[in-house]
Every structure is written in structure tokens, then in C-alpha cells.
Amino acid sequence: APPPRPPTPAPTPPTRPPAPPTFRPHPPPAAPAPAAPPTPRPQPSAAPQLPDRGWRRALRLATFGLIDLGPSPAQRREAQFEQAIQARLYGNYKVGVLGKGGVGKTSVAASVGSLFAELRRQDHVVAIDADTAFGRLGSRIDPASTGSFWELTADQNLRSFDDVVARLGRNAAGLHVLGGEPASGPRRVLDPAIYREATRRLDRHFTISVIDCGSTMDAPLTQEVLRDLDALIVVSSPWADGASAAARTLEWLADHGLTTLLANSLVVLNDSDGHADKRTRALLAREFVDHGRPVIEVPFDPHLRPGGVIDVNSEMAPATRRKFLEVTATIAGYFARRPDRSADRRPPEH
């Protein structure tokens, strides 16, 4: 018989990319586990929807309605998001936006606030710059605005809605903004007491507040902001270092007992420069999802890059707007499931 053949060596496994940052929250034992993110459940439309853009609309118009393919799947999905955003709310609500510098945190805050304002015309929506490192929220919404926390809190004659908005800026979507400390002029540092008084006044008139937070979790102002939030958006770059910072933010919330806020949070992977690697993005997104946090990827959009006023209606790319609609609808779902706190907060005065 022929001699036995030597065994074939096993192939060398391919080299795996570096593992993404690990998020391992350790909430107190008595706290409930984070609930699953809410699924928007829009009410059915009374009439069939017509395509409002693209080749489907062109075909319908060219044939005088004889050929009507209806809205595309993407348009139907957008309509679901919009109906979720427009769901009935009681009282007033706050969502914070956190992230380290350079990840597009302010762009996310301005975009989400603008969509809330555009789609909830019956309410008043305000964006608040609580970033003490010369935040730029005002320049993304209304660069002409000169109002500040100190003016808003010092004036004792601000009784009506019109009195208050005279101290605020506003964009075309209807989003009002309270800017932070200007880069020029005497330096004044926003403290928790001034922030608390300003938001108390704004709560009298605004249903939804979007707060652009500072990047230092242990800062007294950031902790004051977190204390009063109903939902949180954690913004990350689609790179390992940005995701590590986002993971540390979520761990900080768990370690400090903010498990309810953690359950009402989501991660936005924001491609702010257009150089993100698709495979890395997928790995990072899966890491957060595996640890119970919903992740929404926002693609690169040249409109958001220069640093000017954000226009969610005319200038923002449709794919980007669709992702921000999903972010905003998810936050609206968190708002809708909050227990009634009408005794804690005054209803908005219109």
C-alpha cells in the first residue's frame, strides 16, 4: 500500500481589523433595563399620497394623472417619520445633543430642531446653546441673532411670547435659537443658575427644546443640562476614536445612575467629512446596537460642511434629510412614552 499522505496545513485566517470600542454599561441593580427604542406608529392617511418629487411625479404630471405610480418606498418611509414627529405631545420636552468637538454635534442639533419646528407648526421649538467653549449653534440657525442667556434672565419684563422671542433668533423653518457666549467682547461663562433660570422662562412658551451641550461630562453646566432631559442624542464620528468617546459617554450615564436617560438615547454616526470607511461604519454601528442602543448613520452632506446656516428644506440632500427625519422621529417616540410630568413643568403659553 502507498504511504499515507501528510496532512494539509490549515489556511491562515485573514487578519481582522482592530476591534471597535466596547461599551459596557453597569447600571445599578435596581434600575430597569433600557427599553427597546420606540417604533413610530403613524396613523393611516385619509387620502392616497401623491409623489411630490422625482421621476414618479414627472410621469404623473406628463400623463395628466393617467399614470400614477404613487410614492416610492423612500417617500412612504419619510411620511411615516413625519407622522411620528407630528404625534400629539403634552407639556414640554427637552432633548440634549452630546459629542466631542469636530463630530458635527451642532449641525445635528440645528437639523433636528429645524425638523421639529417645520413639522410641528402648532408648537414653538427652541434650540439652546449650552456649550461654554464658544458654541456656534447661533451661526447655524440665525447669525444675526444677538440675544444671550444674560439678557433673557436679566429682563424682568418678558411676560408674553413676543417679549421672549424678541431676545431670540429664528430660521426659515421656524426654529428659534438662544445663542451662547459670543467669541468677541467680555468673557462671561454660563453657569448652572443662569441656565436654569433661562430654561424656566423658555419652558413657559416652548413645547420642545433642543440643547447643544458641552463636551465635558463632569462640568457643572453639563450635569445641570442632563438632569432635566427627556432624551439624548450622542453624536459620534464614523471612526474608532469618535466611537470610543461616544461609548464613554454612554458608560458615564450608566455609572452615574442616569439609566432612564440612557434608555431614551440614540447614537448618530455622522460622516462630517466624506472620508468614512463603509466597513468601519458597519462595525461601529453593530457594536452600539449589540449593546442596546439604536444607531442612525447620517451620510456626508456638503451643505453641512462649510459652517453656515443649515437649510433642511431646500439645501440639505434628500438622503441626509431622510436620516435626520429618522433621528427626529425616534426622539419624538421617546417623548411620547414619557410619563406625564405636567405637575413638574408648566404647559407652554402661546
Question: Locations of the language-model features?
Answer:
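Phosphate-binding loop that captures ATP/GTP phosphates
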Residues: 119-176
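Conserved C-terminal guanine-recognition region of P-loop GTPase G domains, centered on the G4
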Residues: 246-264
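NTP-binding/hydrolysis catalytic cores, primarily Walker-type P-loop NTPases
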Residues: 306-350
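Beta-strand-loop-alpha "switch" segments that mediate conformational coupling across diverse proteins
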Residues: 271-317
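Extreme N-terminal, non-catalytic leader segments
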Residues: 24-96
